[in-house]
Amino acid sequence: MANITMKELLEAGVHFGHQTKRWDPRMKEYIFGERNGIYIIDLQKTLKMFKDASKYVTDMCAQGKVILFVGTKRQAQDAIAEEANRCGMYYINNRWLGGLLTNWVTVQKSVKRLQELDEMATDGRYDLLTKKEVIRLERERKHLQANLAGIKNMRRLPDAIFVVDSNNEAIAVKEARKLGIPVVAVVDTNCDPTVVDYVIPGNDDALRAIRLFTSKIADSVIEGVQMVGDKQFAAEMEGVNTDVQAVAEGEEAPAAEVAAPVAEAAAETEDVDLEAALGGGIRKSPAVVNALDEAEAAESL
């Protein structure tokens, strides 16, 4: 799984939530406090939650499964496309077509139409048509390309989706939940975390924060895919050179096994005073305090 540090989170502005008047009370457990009318997200929680999400993505991809990257807001479009392409996964970054998951059979027809038009544009068939017909087909192709380019080669439903801003991608999240597809999402202080399977509390508006999370999830995918390749290679080599294999298992594997827990321990024990790191001036918001008091009162009844 990919590692992320407190320094990276702070530099990317991941801790900045929305204005205190724009919040979802269900996010209270992920809020550290507020400063100047802005909620401050608890980055210690973000570190832990991201670690869980990253491990899940790596494990999924190590089994040969597929992740769909989703981010249609302007700030997320480039990062979603670039990182999904980098890790060899699929993406939607322009507009989520209603029924993309729940009506996949129909969407596949549009995907096949896009593939057909792409072939026509490159194999010379356009030369046999009139200029007016070519213009019409190109208009159709560009429209389909804008919405479906990222899933043009996706042959089946994804095994999970990674979402930037679960509020903005509410339809995608709803469709995924309806089909039992796990949702990994960057969730800001104005979002409902209960509709997400793997919550990553953080700023879902800042470019640097979006790119940080998206690139780290892509790294998790790459790590998982690499595991698939390693397993296939090991299977092919089994019985070919048992002596070399025995040495590798006896010497190299333990080193890797020691390194992994060390890295995980470092990530878990990165204890930073957020108030000191952010320059102070942070206080528990009355809204958060009241919400917590109400929750405790309800539990005691």
Curated annotation (Swiss-Prot):
GO cellular component: cytosolic small ribosomal subunit
Protein name (Swiss-Prot/TrEMBL): Small ribosomal subunit protein uS2
Family annotation (CDD domains): RPS2
GO molecular function: structural constituent of ribosome
Similarity-based family: Belongs to the universal ribosomal protein uS2 family.
Originating organism: Acidobacterium capsulatum (strain ATCC 51196 / DSM 11244 / BCRC 80197 / JCM 7670 / NBRC 15755 / NCIMB 13165 / 161)
Coiled coil: none
PANTHER family: 30S RIBOSOMAL PROTEIN S2 PROKARYOTIC AND ORGANELLAR, SMALL RIBOSOMAL SUBUNIT PROTEIN US2M
Record-linked PROSITE patterns: RIBOSOMAL_S2_1, RIBOSOMAL_S2_2
BP terms from Gene Ontology: translation
Tree of life domain: Bacteria
Pfam families: Ribosomal_S2
